[in-house]
Amino acid sequence: MSTAGPRAGSAPGRVPTGGAALREALVALQRDLAIDEATVRRIVEGAVVDTYRRLVADDPEVQARVDLGAGSVGLFRDDGRGGSAPVEAPVADFARQAAQAAKAAVAGWAREAERERVIREGMAQKGELIDVLVERLDGALWWVRAGNLAALLPPEEQTPGEQLQRQQHLKVVVIDVRRRQRDAVVVVSRTHPSLLRRLLEQEVPELADGRVLVKAVAREAGRRSKVAVHAPEAGIDAQGACIGPRGVRIRAVVSELGEEQVQVVEWSADPAEYVASALAPAQVSAVELDNETRTAHAVVPDDQLSLAIGRSGENARLAARLTGWRIDISGESGHPRRETATSPAPEGEDAG
């Protein structure tokens, strides 16, 4: 389609761009992406001018005017008398290239707008619990959706052994928004400590209103977790509130986590008491602290030693992560110590 000269019945300078088709495309973009008319006009006009300067002449005074009703664009420049003079584009195939550039510009704007929307909505929900629908598996990656927000559940954030199914509903916590060159993706987790924290807040009114606080969470997702809780005001049983009458509240949380064992312990400002509490269900006879190395030596009855350590060191390891202390455990009769190293608490876990 050439614009080497004015077409019969057309105004000089008019760039034909497929009329009805362009008009329908622009209307659809405005509807689906909520692009206002002024923005569409600005994007299309800029793309047409850029095409003219690239193919015809680098004239800084050339401007474009889009007619959304007709689905066409006109080129003009200031005539110096307060009016405008039409500008021809005497290049074969200019109209097609201008139309392609306009559509590409709108698509690029829409892509960037979508990227910013994902970033904005994802950041607003970071750390929050959301309900999602499992949509599809892409290799080891699960894609899930919450309303109009698609999210990624990568392998490292999937609970070991948990088998997901398409169209399955589940709860996840938003942990990140990854900015990529052309888009952005929200990352969610089933293993992050914040998931357990948010699930408890959902089930325990005393947590939701601040009468009970979650001070720390340590998880080995799919297997076992420990949660340290505290009630700032006297007279409130923080541990009992989280467990609920006959364990109904904690069972609701466990059922969402695929039968992961969740143990609620009392937090204490006294590190020795806190370490003893964190080693439950084992009974602890005494705890000695080395503040310089931040090491706690716990002494337990001989028949409690295996329980304090746990299978493959699991109980002691979680207690160390929960408290932020390195914990050595020995029996009362002087059994060799079990050393349990601890590293800084992962994101979302507070040593309290």
What do the PLM-derived regions correspond to, one by one?
Residues 1-352:
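RNA-contacting regions in translation and RNA-metabolism proteins
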